[in-house]
A protein has these predicted regions:
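Transmembrane beta-barrel strand/turn architecture of Gram-negative outer membrane proteins
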Residues: 18-42, 132-155, 245-254
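Short loop/turn motifs that connect adjacent beta-strands in outer-membrane beta-barrel proteins
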Residues: 30-37, 100-105, 143-153, 209-219, ...
C-alpha cells in the first residue's frame, strides 16, 4: 500500500493526492526439487488533482489537454478551477516454475495483466478511458561449476494500450417543484481506440562469475547484454504515427583486488553500442505547438546511434564508530557517450555510503 500527498507550487499541478495498493494472493506446491506457483493480483491506483492552486504568476502560462501524438490543446490560464481524477483497476495472474539442485537453479514466470483507467473531471465529466494488456516472460538461471557460476537472465515484456475518447455535453435539470438544479455529463460520441500504443522490451543478460573457494565471495566477472525495444504510437481520425525500434549490445567485466579483512578494491568496466534500427514520424499537422517543441526535436534523439563506455572504481573497508562496525565504501564513476550525430556527453560522479 502506498499513499501520497504531492505538492508542486511552481507550476499548476499542486496538491495531488495518491492512493496505490495491491493485493496478491498466491499458492505454491513443492515436490522433490521442483516448485510450482500460481498467484493472482488486484492493483488499484487513484490519483486525484483537486482545484489547482499555484504561486505561478506568468499570465501566458498554458495548461494542455493531451489526446495523442501532436494533438495537445493549450489554454492560457486553463488550470484555473481545473479538476482531474485518474482511477486505474488492474487484474492479473502469474504462473511460475522453479527447479533447484546443488548445481542448477532456474526460475521461469509467465504473467498476464488487464487494466482499465477511468479519467474524471468535475461532476464525473470524463474525457476518455485507457485500457492496457500486459504480457511478461521472465527466466532466471544459475549454473554452478566449481568456483565459477553462469548467470543467464531473459525477460520479454509486451504491452498494448488503447485510449477511447469521449465527446460529452453537460445537462442541467431543474426540479419544477423544489427549484433544485442537478447536472450530469451525457456522452454524445465515443472514439473507440482513437490512440493506441504498442511497447515491446526484450532483454538477454549473460554473466560468468568467479568466486573465492573458501568464502564464496565474488572476485571477478565478465558478461554481455543485448536489449531490444520497439515502440509504436498511432493516432486515428486524423492519422498520425510514431515508430521507433532500437537495440543495444554491451560487454561488461569487473575484478576485485586487495581482498582482506572486509576490504576490497573493485574495478568495473562496461562498453557497448546502441543501434537506431528505425525512427519514423508521420504527422497529420506538423505545425502544432507540441509537434514543433517536442515530437520533431525528439526525432534527432530517436534516430541517433551511439557508442558508450563506463568505468567504475569502488573501495570498501570496515569502519568502527562508537563500537559499531559497518562496511563503508567510496565509489568513483566516469562515463562517455559519442553519437553518430557528432554529439557527445560526459559524466563523472562520486559517492560515499555503507552496507548495513
Amino acid at each position: 500500500y502506498k499513499g501520497g500527498y504531492l505538492s508542486r507550487l511552481k507550476y499548476p499541478r499542486a496538491r495531488t493526492n495518491l492512493a496505490d495498493y495491491q493485493l496478491t494472493p498466491a499458492v505454491t506446491y513443492t515436490w522433490n526439487k521442483h516448485s510450482l506457483g500460481l498467484s493472482g493480483y488486484y492493483h488499484r491506483r487513484k490519483e486525484k488533482i483537486p482545484n489547482i492552486t499555484t504561486v505561478q504568476t506568468d499570465p501566458n502560462l498554458k495548461y494542455y489537454t493531451f489526446t495523442g501524438m501532436e494533438n495537445a490543446d493549450g489554454t492560457t490560464g486553463g488550470y484555473s478551477g481545473f479538476e482531474r481524477e485518474f482511477v486505474n483497476h488492474e487484474f492479473g495472474g502469474e504462473l511460475s516454475y522453479q527447479y533447484k539442485n546443488e548445481r542448477i537453479q532456474t526460475l521461469t514466470t509467465l504473467s498476464y495483466a488487464k487494466g482499465n483507467e477511468d479519467v474524471w473531471g468535475d461532476i464525473k465529466y470524463s474525457p476518455g478511458k485507457y485500457h492496457t494488456t500486459t504480457y511478461n516472460l521472465l527466466s532466471m538461471n544459475r549454473i554452478k561449476s566449481g568456483r565459477t557460476e553462469h548467470i543467464i537472465d531473459i525477460s520479454i515484456n509486451y504491452q498494448t494500450g488503447k485510449a477511447d475518447e469521449y465527446r460529452q455535453e453537460k445537462i442541467i435539470e431543474k426540479d419544477p417543484v423544489t427549484g433544485i438544479e442537478s447536472s450530469y455529463w451525457n456522452t454524445l460520441l465515443t472514439y473507440d481506440e482513437r490512440y493506441t500504443v504498442d511497447l515491446l522490451n526484450a532483454n538477454l543478460h549473460y554473466r560468468l562469475l568467479w568466486s573465492n573457494h573458501h568464502t564464496g565471495e565474488a572476485t571477478a566477472y565478465a558478461g554481455a547484454r543485448a536489449y531490444f525495444q520497439s515502440v509504436e504510437d498511432q493516432y486515428n481520425l486524423p492519422s498520425s504515427s510514431l515508430t521507433v525500434r532500437q537495440a543495444t549490445i554491451c560487454m561488461e567485466g569487473g575484478y576485485s583486488f586487495l581482498r582482506k579483512n572486509n576490504r576490497s578494491l573493485w574495478i568495473e568496466a562496461e562498453a557497448g553500442y546502441h543501434i537506431s534500427l528505425s525512427s519514423d514520424l508521420s504527422l497529420n499537422d506538423p505545425s502544432t505547438e507540441y509537434a514543433q517543441s517536442v515530437l520533431l526535436p525528439d526525432m534527432t534523439y530517436y534516430g541517433a546511434s551511439y557508442a558508450h563506455g563506463k568505468l567504475q572504481i569502488q573501495y570498501q573497508m570496515p569502519v568502527t564508530i562508537k563500537k559499531h562496525t559497518n562496511v563503508w565504501f567510496v565509489k568513483a564513476t566516469g562515463a562517455y557517450l559519442k553519437t553518430d550525430k557528432k554529439t557527445d556527453s560526459k559524466m563523472f560522479g562520486i559517492s560515499l555510503g555503507l552496507y548495513h
